[in-house]
Regions:
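Short glycine/proline- and aromatic-enriched beta-strand/turn motifs that initiate or cap beta-hairpins
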Residues: 19-81, 214, 218-220, 224-229
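Generic detector of N-terminal low-structure segments
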Residues: 7-11, 59, 165, 177
Length: 229
């Protein structure tokens, strides 16, 4: 990972040296990430996530075709393979951060087509809470407690982004991007917290279970508008 960030840092420095021949694209659009994650625990099903949100990106390229790209996504995550909440479909939060470099194969006045190798980090968080649930403990008054549970999934991925931009004016344009990634692996944390009254004070008991995540894929189509300068 250190080598990857070193390469990208050097790439950005080189882009500054070629500033006169450098074109930048900044934009935002609607994105629909879909992923499948394997859980390294007996009896646990794979986790399929379908997300809906927004993505912002920067893509810059030199006249010689060298290209760098970075993007950030934030989205609403949905999954029927997570049973944290008392619903058929659980709803959570998803974020993705990716950086990479590659080559722009088409660089005409209006049309730009680039392929970049990308490395990214995904975070998904699902939460649930309830008041006055049954909690049998010797110090719990009335055997009732407030319940909070958080499931966090962190995965690493690498793959390629296929980016196309069409300029509709001097600086304004539309774009589409398809991210195709392999999930290297990751880890999950399932944390449950019970907060209760002992009659003298308020206490909390926290139980956390960790598991490894692995494999499968992430596909993320995006389309929107961009500014070229």
């Amino acid at each position: 990972m250190k080598k990857i960030f070193t390469f990208l840092f050097v790439s950005l420095i080189m882009s500054g040296l070629f500033a006169k021949s450098w074109e930048s694209n900044v934009g935002a659009g609607f994105t629909v990430p879909f992923s499948r994650i394997g859980v390294d625990k007996a009896g646990e099903d794979d986790i399929n996530q379908l997300c809906f949100g927004l993505e912002g990106f920067y893509l810059g390229h030199h006249d010689n075709g060298f290209t760098v790209k970075g993007d950030y996504s934030i989205a609403l995550a949905t999954s029927r393979d997570i049973t944290l909440q008392d619903h058929q479909t659980n709803v959570g939060f998803f974020t993705d951060t990716s950086i990479g470099a590659g080559y722009s194969f088409i660089r005409s006045d209006n049309l730009l087509f680039s392929i970049t190798g990308m490395f990214g980090v995904n975070i998904s968080i699902f939460k649930d809470s309830n008041d006055d649930v049954d909690y049998n403990h010797e110090n719990v008054e009335d055997n009732k407690a407030d319940y909070d549970r958080t499931l966090s999934l962190v995965t690493l991925n690498f793959g390629a982004d296929f980016f196309m931009r069409y300029k509709m004016g001097e600086n304004f344009g539309i774009f589409t991007n398809l991210a195709a990634r392999y999930i290297i692996g990751g880890w999950g944390a399932d944390e449950t917290c019970y907060t209760y009254d002992t009659g003298r004070n308020t206490r909390s008991d926290t139980i956390t279970h960790y598991t490894d995540l692995w494999g499968y894929f992430q596909v993320q189509p995006t389309f929107g508008v961009c500014w070229t300068f």
